[in-house]
């Protein structure tokens, strides 16, 4: 996901996406804890996506 794509979305859409990403992160952490996570790069990828969404939300709030 690109930051430019996120900037085109509304705050409500971004909040919904953020909740989905947080759920994904939780599920991936549980899979890692139980040894079922085969693609460990997904954890850091989701973490970065969360940071991107939060950054865009803060930028929109500052305007």
UniProtKB/Swiss-Prot annotation:
- Segments passing through the bilayer: none
Kindly state which keywords UniProt assigns to this record, in alphabetical order.
Answer: Ribonucleoprotein, Ribosomal protein
The molecular function GO annotations come to: structural constituent of ribosome
Give the InterPro entries listed for this entry. Answer: Ribosomal_protein_uL29 (IPR050063), Ribosomal_uL29 (IPR001854), Ribosomal_uL29_CS (IPR018254), Ribosomal_uL29_sf (IPR036049)
Residues spanning the signal sequence: none
* PROSITE patterns in UniProt: RIBOSOMAL_L29 (PS00579)
The superkingdom of the source organism is Bacteria
- What processes in GO biological process is this protein linked to? translation
Q: Which GO terms describe its cellular component?
A: cytosolic large ribosomal subunit
Q: Tell me which HAMAP family the record gives.
A: Ribosomal_uL29 (MF_00374)
PANTHER family in UniProt:
60S RIBOSOMAL PROTEIN L35/50S RIBOSOMAL PROTEIN L29 (PTHR10916), LARGE RIBOSOMAL SUBUNIT PROTEIN UL29C (PTHR10916:SF0)
Q: Which family does it belong to?
A: Belongs to the universal ribosomal protein uL29 family.
What is this protein's record name? Large ribosomal subunit protein uL29
Q: Which organism is it from?
A: Pseudomonas syringae pv. tomato (strain ATCC BAA-871 / DC3000)
What does the record give as the organism's lineage? Answer: Bacteria, Pseudomonadati, Pseudomonadota, Gammaproteobacteria, Pseudomonadales
């Amino acid at each position: 996901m690109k930051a430019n794509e996120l900037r085109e979305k509304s705050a409500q859409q971004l909040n919904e996406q953020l909740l989905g990403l947080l759920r994904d992160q939780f599920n991936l952490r549980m899979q890692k804890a139980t040894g079922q996570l085969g693609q460990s790069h997904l954890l850091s990828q989701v973490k970065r996506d969360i940071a991107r969404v939060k950054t865009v939300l803060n930028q929109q709030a500052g305007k």
